Amino acid sequence: MNLIVSSAPHIRSPRTTKHIMLDVLIALLPATAAGIVFFGWVAAVTIVLAMFTAVLTEFVWYIIEHKIWRNGKETLANFAAQFDFTSLVTGLLLALCCPASLEALYMPVLGAIFAIAVVKMLFGGTGKNIVNPAIAGRVFLFISFMAMVSYPEANFAPLLSYTDGALST
C-alpha cells in the first residue's frame, strides 16, 4: 500500500475564484433587495458607494503596485483580466453590515478603503488576508465613529401594520 502525501488543496475544481465570487454576489441579491426595500434609498446609496470604492481602491492599488500609470488603456485591460469580483463582494458585505441609519455617506467609503487597502491588499491580496476584509472595515467604522454606528434605527412599522400585536408580548 502506497501512501501519497501532498499539500493542499486536496480537492481540485475547474471553478475559478471569479466564478465563486460571482455565485456569492448572486446569493447576496435577496438580502440586498430586502435591505433596499426595508431601508430605502440610503441603503441603496450605501451599497453603491461601498462597492464602487472597493473596486476603485483595488484598481488604484493595482496601478501603484505594478507601476503602470502611464498607459491607461493597457492598465484597464490588465486590471479587467485579473479582476475576480472579490472587491465587489467585500464592498457589498460591508454595506450590508452597516446600520440603516448611516446617513454620513463618507463612512462606507472609508470602510471600503480600509477593508481593501489595509486588510486585503497589504497582506498580499485575495486569499492571503488574516481576517475578513468586510468585517474588519465594519470594525474600523465602529471604532472610528462609535456614536454614529452603534444605535441603528429600523422602521418595520409598515411591514408589521398588517399583523396587530406582532411586537407586543
Where are these regions (language model features)?
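C-terminal ends of transmembrane helices
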Residues: L56-G72, I116-K128
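N-terminal signal-anchor module of multipass membrane proteins
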Residues: M1-F59
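Helix-coil boundary and interhelical linker segments in multi-pass alpha-helical membrane proteins
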Residues: A33-V45, C98-L105, A147-F156
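Cytoplasmic-side transmembrane-helix entry/capping segments in multi-pass membrane proteins
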Residues: K73-V89, P108-L110, K128-V139
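Long hydrophobic alpha-helical segments that form multi-pass transmembrane helix bundles
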Residues: P133-T169
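Alpha-helical transmembrane segments in multi-pass membrane proteins
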Residues: D23-A31, T46-E58, S87-A95, P99, ...
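Signature of multi-pass transmembrane helix bundles
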Residues: I4, S13-A27, S101-L102, Y106-M107, ...
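Short, amphipathic, aromatic/basic-enriched membrane-interface segments that mark the entry/exit
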Residues: I11-M21, Y62-F83, P99-E103
